């Protein structure tokens, strides 16, 4: 689907919620749900160590905001003091919060914002940030997951956060670590995805819950989410900044009043990746890649400071290429990011959620790469190829023989969790309605697999000969000659891909064939050419020699220790 820029006019605010939600509505069912939410709240005793932590967390954020206000009044973008405060917040966010969660709230929620509000002087901005972490923890770790009310409240909190950032008269006096900014965008889309699937599963829901969903169609609406992401992109002027950056210019020169601040610049960049993800979940792969048209994927960028953002970008771009039948580009993207993960895996602590997420996407991308290489055999990095053979060697052989069940199994494991942007008809919801987006994408994928079912066998026969009568080769395959000619045409068509060669836009490219065999038909004779490039063993041996030398040095150092 194509979205014109005016569809996301920031003056239109579909993600704003009804003001009367916080009071009685006159609807008995809605009021009952509202009252039940507060009746069930239990005011837990907050441990002293948590009180001290929250006060310290608040003071750090408050000091940063005060300093940022001063910097803005002095017309300065940033300073060493701001950087120092951001570093302190990063330590709190990535270390202290995680350790205290593990110790006190492993499977239980943190104290509610209302309970800690007196500790922080009812600081509205801090409470919004606290609730962002509070609800995210409920989604990730709390047994049973979020209730319907918590899903709604988390949505309202994101509305408050984005309104604070987007609707201020000037740049908001706030800076946050890049990791937290990425996690905000990532979690925002995840919660939308989770709610989209939740509202489609009506079998176990009470009439009260269904009525509550029916009367609040704007909550977690797809237009709300798109509007937020596009507003952040527009506010930051990130596309223009990237355009100038990739052409060798200074992005600051076109950043504008908001985009020169790290908060807006990074949220804008992460929102582009968020749009890539969202359009992929909706099955619009062309639009998914189009939003990245100013990001040069094949070049290390100053904006790529968060590993999870890098991995997510390459996962969705690689998957979109696969579904667009651009196998060569899909293979290149997956191989590049898998090599990156292989070389940087030691950076991630094995106990953190980061490691879990990256490890899962690493496994999924290996599965997708095995599919792409089966459908379009070509050479890739030796170390990645070795890993692939270890993990999926047997399944790749079965896929080469046309086993559709293995294709489906790997696709099911590795594909994104597709969703429908449409609110279901609650009066008549199919029990499998939540599966329909996945089944639609699976059908598209398996149709393509079916079209290529004979190609692997044809390729293996073509490799054996230089010339062969068409009728004879058709006989080997037990196909009528006319059907075999059709399959040869399919082979020619499917082995020719649109391939990115240069330029910034990932949609650009030229038609190429990387098939190891090529042929032409002259009258009733097939003439076959082996286009396989001889393997360069020299590079492989040089890499192994370097590894051996490093190992030798390490062993010598160990032997020298007293």
From Swiss-Prot:
Biased composition (Low complexity): 11-20
Protein purpose: Component of the eukaryotic translation initiation factor 3 (eIF-3) complex, which is involved in protein synthesis of a specialized repertoire of mRNAs and, together with other initiation factors, stimulates binding of mRNA and methionyl-tRNAi to the 40S ribosome. The eIF-3 complex specifically targets and initiates translation of a subset of mRNAs involved in cell proliferation.
The protein, known as: Eukaryotic translation initiation factor 3 subunit L
Region (Disordered): 1-29
Compartments reported by the entry: Cytoplasm
InterPro entries: eIF3l, PCI_dom, TPR-like_helical_dom_sf
Subunit structure, as described in the record: Component of the eukaryotic translation initiation factor 3 (eIF-3) complex, which is composed of 13 subunits: eif3a, eif3b, eif3c, eif3d, eif3e, eif3f, eif3g, eif3h, eif3i, eif3j, eif3k, eif3l and eif3m.
GO molecular function: translation initiation factor activity
Boundaries of every PCI domain copy: 329-535
Keyword Nuclease recorded: no
Short name of one Pfam family: Paf67
Entry keyword set: Cytoplasm, Initiation factor, Protein biosynthesis
CC per GO annotation: eukaryotic 43S preinitiation complex; eukaryotic 48S preinitiation complex; eukaryotic translation initiation factor 3 complex
An example Gene Ontology biological process: translational initiation
Family: Belongs to the eIF-3 subunit L family.
């Amino acid at each position: 689907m194509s979205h014109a820029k005016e569809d996301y006019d920031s003056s239109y605010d579909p993600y704003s919620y009804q003001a009367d939600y916080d009071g009685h509505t006159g609807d008995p069912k809605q009021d009952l749900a509202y009252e039940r939410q507060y009746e069930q709240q239990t005011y837990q005793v907050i441990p002293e160590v948590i009180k001290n932590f929250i006060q310290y967390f608040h003071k750090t954020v408050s000091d940063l905001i005060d300093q940022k206000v001063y910097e803005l009044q002095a017309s300065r973008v940033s300073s060493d003091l701001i950087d120092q405060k951001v570093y302190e917040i990063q330590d709190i966010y990535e270390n202290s919060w995680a350790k205290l969660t593990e110790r006190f709230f492993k499977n239980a929620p943190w104290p509610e914002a209302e309970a800690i509000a007196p500790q922080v002087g009812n600081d509205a901005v801090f409470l919004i940030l606290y609730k962002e972490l509070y609800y995210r923890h409920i989604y990730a770790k709390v047994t049973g997951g979020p209730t319907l009310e918590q899903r709604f409240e988390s949505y309202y909190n994101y509305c408050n956060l984005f309104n604070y950032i987007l609707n201020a008269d000037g740049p908001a006096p706030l800076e946050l670590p890049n990791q937290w900014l990425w996690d905000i965008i990532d979690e925002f889309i995840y919660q939308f995805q989770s709610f989209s699937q939740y509202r489609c599963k009506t079998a176990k829901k009470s009439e009260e819950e269904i009525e509550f969903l029916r009367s609040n169609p704007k909550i977690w609406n797809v237009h709300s989410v798109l509007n937020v992401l596009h507003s952040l992109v527009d506010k930051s002027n990130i596309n223009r900044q990237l355009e100038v950056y990739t052409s060798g210019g200074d992005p600051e020169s076109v950043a504008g009043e908001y985009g020169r601040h790290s908060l807006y610049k990074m949220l804008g960049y992460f929102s582009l990746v968020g749009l890539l993800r969202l359009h992929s979940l909706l099955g619009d792969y062309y639009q998914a890649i189009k939003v990245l048209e100013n990001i040069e994927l094949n070049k290390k960028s100053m904006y790529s400071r968060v590993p999870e953002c890098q991995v997510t970008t390459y996962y969705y771009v690689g998957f979109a290429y696969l579904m667009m039948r651009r196998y060569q580009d899909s293979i290149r993207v997956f191989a590049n990011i898998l090599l990156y993960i292989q070389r940087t895996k030691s950076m991630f602590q094995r106990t953190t959620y980061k490691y879990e997420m990256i490890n899962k996407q690493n496994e999924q991308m290996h599965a997708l790469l095995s599919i792409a290489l089966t459908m379009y055999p070509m050479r890739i990095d030796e170390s990645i190829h070795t890993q692939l053979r270890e993990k999926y060697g047997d399944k790749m052989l079965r896929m080469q023989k046309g086993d559709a069940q293995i294709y489906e199994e790997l696709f099911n494991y590795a594909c994104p969790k597709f969703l429908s942007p449409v609110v279901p008809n609650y009066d008549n919801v199919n029990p499998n309605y939540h599966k329909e987006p996945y089944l639609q994408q699976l059908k598209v994928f398996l149709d393509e697999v079916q079209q290529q079912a004979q190609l692997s066998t044809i390729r293996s026969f073509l490799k054996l000969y230089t010339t062969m009568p068409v009728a004879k080769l058709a006989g080997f395959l037990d196909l009528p000659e006319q059907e075999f000619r059709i399959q040869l045409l399919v082979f020619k068509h499917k082995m020719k891909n649109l391939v990115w060669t240069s330029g910034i836009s990932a949609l650009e490219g030229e038609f190429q064939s990387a098939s190891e065999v090529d042929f032409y038909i002259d009258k009733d004779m097939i003439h076959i050419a082996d286009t396989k490039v001889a393997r360069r063993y020299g590079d492989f041996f040089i890499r192994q020699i370097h590894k051996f030398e490093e190992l030798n040095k390490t062993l010598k150092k160990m032997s020298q220790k007293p």
